C-alpha cells in the first residue's frame, strides 16, 4: 500500500467536502468472464482495487471508507464461489492488516460475523484489536452484512432494554435507534459509489445513507482506479446537498 505519512486527520474538511464514502464493489464476476477466467479470479483482481481505494481515501482526507465485501444474500451463490470468497477474506486479513496498522488505518468489520467459521472470526478479532487505536482512516468492511439486518439488530437491542425496564417505548426516536446501528459513532455516509453499471442499493446501509449522494459508474470494480475515485469525488463536490430542503432562496420547490 502506498500511503502517506501517518497522522491524525485534520479537523478541516478537504476541498471535496466528503468525510465518509461507501462503495458497492460490483463487477468482479463480469470482469473475470471478459478475461475468460472463473469468478474467483475476478475477486482476487478486485482485492487490488481495494488497496488502491484505501490508499486514495487515506491520502485525500476521507475519514471513513466503507466497502461492501459480502452481503447476507451472497450465501446463495455457488458453494465453490462462497468458499473462495471466505479464503480470500482470510488471505486479505493476513496479508494487509500489518500494512494498514503501519499506516494508521483502523479496520472494522461490520455485519453478522457469527456465521463465519472460527478461523475467520479469530482473524477478524485480532485484526480489529491490532488497529483499534489508530487515528487515521477508518476502513469498514461490510461482511455478511445487510441493511435490513442492521436495522433489525438495532431494534432488538432497544426491545431488550424495554423488556428489562430500562427504557420506555415512547422514549424511542430516530436518534436513539441511530445509536444502535453499525457505524453510529462515525460521520454519516456522504457518498455511495456503485461500480459495474447497476443502479440499485442492494440492501446496503439502508439507514446510514438516507441523505447520501449516489454515484453510479459502468466501470467494473477491478478496473476502478484513483482517477475513477477522483471523478466520483468531483461529482460529489458539484452537487448541492439539500437534506430534504429546497434550494436557497427557492420558495416554490
Swiss-Prot record:
Consequence of changing residue 75 to A/F = Decrease in activity; reduced affinity for decaprenyl diphosphate substrate analog
The superkingdom of the source organism is Bacteria
**What does the UniProt entry list as the effect of changing residue 73 to A?**
Slight decrease in activity
What EC number(s) has UniProt assigned to this enzyme?
2.5.1.31
Keywords, alphabetical: Cell cycle, Cell division, Cell shape, Cell wall biogenesis/degradation, Magnesium, Metal-binding, Peptidoglycan synthesis, Transferase
The entry marks the following residues as binding Mg(2+), namely 26, 199, 213
Which cofactors are reported in the record for this sequence?
A: Mg(2+)
What changing residue 71 to A does, per the record, is: Decrease in activity
Effect listed in the UniProt record for changing residue 26 to A = Great decrease in activity
Q: What is the effect of changing residue 77 to A?
A: Decrease in activity
Q: Which GO terms describe its molecular function?
A: ditrans,polycis-undecaprenyl-diphosphate synthase [(2E,6E)-farnesyl-diphosphate specific] activity; magnesium ion binding; protein homodimerization activity; small molecule binding
Q: Effect of altering residue 81 to A?
A: Slight decrease in activity
Which residues are noted in the entry as isopentenyl diphosphate-binding?
213
Record annotation: effect of changing residue 105 to A: Formation predominantly of C(60), C(65) and C(70) polymers rather than the C(55) polymer
Altering residue 218 to A: what's the impact?
Answer: Slight decrease in activity
Q: Which cellular components does GO assign to this protein?
A: cytoplasm; cytosol
Q: Which residues form the active site?
A: 26, 74
HAMAP family linked: ISPT (MF_01139)
The free-text function statement in the UniProt record for this protein reads:
Generates ditrans,octacis-undecaprenyl pyrophosphate (UPP) from isopentenyl pyrophosphate (IPP) and farnesyl diphosphate (FPP). UPP is the precursor of glycosyl carrier lipid in the biosynthesis of bacterial cell wall polysaccharide components such as peptidoglycan and lipopolysaccharide.
Q: Quaternary structure?
A: Homodimer.
Protein known as: Ditrans,polycis-undecaprenyl-diphosphate synthase ((2E,6E)-farnesyl-diphosphate specific)
Instruction: Name the source organism.
Output: Escherichia coli (strain K12)
Amino acid at each position: 500500500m502506498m500511503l502517506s505519512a501517518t497522522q491524525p486527520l485534520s479537523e478541516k474538511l478537504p476541498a471535496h467536502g466528503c468525510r465518509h464514502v461507501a462503495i458497492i464493489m460490483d463487477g468482479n464476476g463480469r470482469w473475470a468472464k471478459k478475461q475468460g477466467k472463473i469468478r474467483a479470479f475476478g475477486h482476487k483482481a478486485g482485492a487490488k482495487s481495494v488497496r488502491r481505494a484505501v490508499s486514495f481515501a487515506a491520502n485525500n482526507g476521507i475519514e471513513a471508507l466503507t466497502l461492501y465485501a459480502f452481503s447476507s444474500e451472497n450465501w446463495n451463490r455457488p458453494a465453490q464461489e462462497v468458499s473462495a470468497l471466505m479464503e480470500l477474506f482470510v488471505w486479505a486479513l493476513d496479508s494487509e492488516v500489518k500494512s494498514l496498522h503501519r499506516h494508521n488505518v483502523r479496520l472494522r468489520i461490520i455485519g453478522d460475523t457469527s456465521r463465519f467459521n472460527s478461523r475467520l472470526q479469530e482473524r477478524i478479532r485480532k485484526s480489529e484489536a491490532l488497529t483499534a487505536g489508530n487515528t487515521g482512516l477508518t476502513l469498514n468492511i461490510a461482511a455478511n452484512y445487510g441493511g435490513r439486518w442492521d436495522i433489525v439488530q438495532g431494534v432488538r437491542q432497544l426491545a431488550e432494554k424495554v423488556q428489562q425496564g430500562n427504557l420506555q417505548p415512547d422514549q424511542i426516536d430516530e436518534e436513539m435507534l441511530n445509536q444502535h446501528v453499525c457505524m453510529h459513532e462515525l460521520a454519516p455516509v456522504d457518498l455511495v459509489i456503485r461500480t459495474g453499471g447497476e443502479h440499485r442499493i442492494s440492501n446496503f446501509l439502508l439507514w446510514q445513507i438516507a441523505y447520501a449522494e449516489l454515484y453510479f459508474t459502468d466501470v467494473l470494480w477491478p478496473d476502478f482506479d484513483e482517477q475513477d475515485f477522483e471523478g466520483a469525488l468531483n461529482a460529489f463536490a458539484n452537487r448541492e446537498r439539500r437534506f430534504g430542503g429546497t434550494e436557497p432562496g427557492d420558495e416554490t420547490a
